[in-house]
Amino acid sequence: MFVDTHCHLTMLDLTPYAGDLDVALQQARDAGVSKFMSISVNLDDHIALAEIAARHSDVGYSVGVHPCEDPATMARATTDYLIELAQPEKVWAIGETGLDYFHSTDFIAEQKQCFARHIHASQAVKKPVVVHTRAAKHDTVDIIRAEKSTHGILHCFTEDWETAKAVLDCGYYVSFSGIVSFKNAQDLRDVAK
């Protein structure tokens, strides 16, 4: 049995599945996936994700704003608004949130503030936070520690052992993507061990 803890069902290219999400989900079920958590990247995703989750008992979703979204969208993600969006039973997590300095360093302050608000919402509704971090490992760990966040996952982890240990010590999980299989990813494979 497998659980896909990080899929983007609203972004999936359905061409190989005759344009039908149900076909894609059934193929995954046939391969042993028993639950799917579709991850939100902006404040409008929850509408489509709620509709998908209502049709599929094995699909839940998250609510949140990806750190590469524009500052105006990040500003709309207040703690209270995230708490409001997180009320449905099928909302299993808060996020995708975090810090991404790889794509842009123009809005670091906004990313940090938005990340902290997601953590506050996560704590208020007692649901885990889904964290994206890229080229921002120190600030990510610092915010998790400062906010005393103890329930979450760093997805698509590509950082070093020290970062993994720091978030594991906070009660977080880390997940690895297919990147771990790349020939030049021996350091990442060592972290996964």
Please tell me what each predicted stretch does:
Residues M1-K193:
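Mid-domain alpha/beta scaffold segments of enzyme catalytic cores
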